[in-house]
Amino acid sequence: KHYSEMLPVEYVPTDQYMQVYHNALKHYAKPVANAVGMLADKIIENKGKKMVLVSLARAGIPIGILVKRYIKFKYGINVPHYSISIIRGRGIDDNAMKYLLEKYRPQQILFVDGWIGKGAILNELKKDISAYEGVSADIAVVADPANVTELCGTHEDILIPSSCLNSTVSGLISRTFLRDDIIGRDDFHGAVYYGELTDSDLSYDFIETIEKEFNMENTPDLEKRVESQGIDEVINIGKNFGIDDINLIKPGI
């Protein structure tokens, strides 16, 4: 079966694991807020004030909310924000794209994600978006350690604390799924709501903790010459370990 046809059981993280998350949030709230501000400034500068933020589900959801809130904080603009499913090997949610394009001009749509690791989803997006004339395949991200986009808050490999958690920092929704026996031809891709995890939900806590660190002025990265892209590292790891499928290689700690 394709991974998009299955959903894992999601558990409440252990107290020890949650301590790691809270420590990460304490140490990285300010750098993440700074990067969100830098990203929002670049979005306004490059895309104007009429853009529509479209988060890639699900890691992009809290990031899109932070960018939306920063733009409201600094520029006083309440930009629309949506989330859309994109599944490696299955593509972007075509019905959701049609819905968006009935409401907005193609040039207004801007995709948002948390970070770019090796660029697999970016490549999927570029392939799919060519079918929608006028829609840009650019992704706005907080962190781009892969060095593939300038539309980012930082190229530093900062730890975005929301990456430590699953549904409990993303509004209690699962990653998206696509199964023919559940999802009809005219339906959006599916997701499950984990209501049983309500008592462990930290979605608003994460957003509000970062939001408290927002500044009107943000500190840009020192310009650094990009020597290589993250995908080059992944390919080299694959060669060294005899792994042909780069989807089996996950950049991380």
Regions found by a protein language model. Name each.
Residues 1-51, 72, 76-253:
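Long, low-complexity, Lys/Arg-enriched
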Residues 60, 69-73:
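Long, mid-chain structured domain cores
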Residues 66:
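Active-site signature of alpha/beta-hydrolase-fold catalytic machinery across serine-
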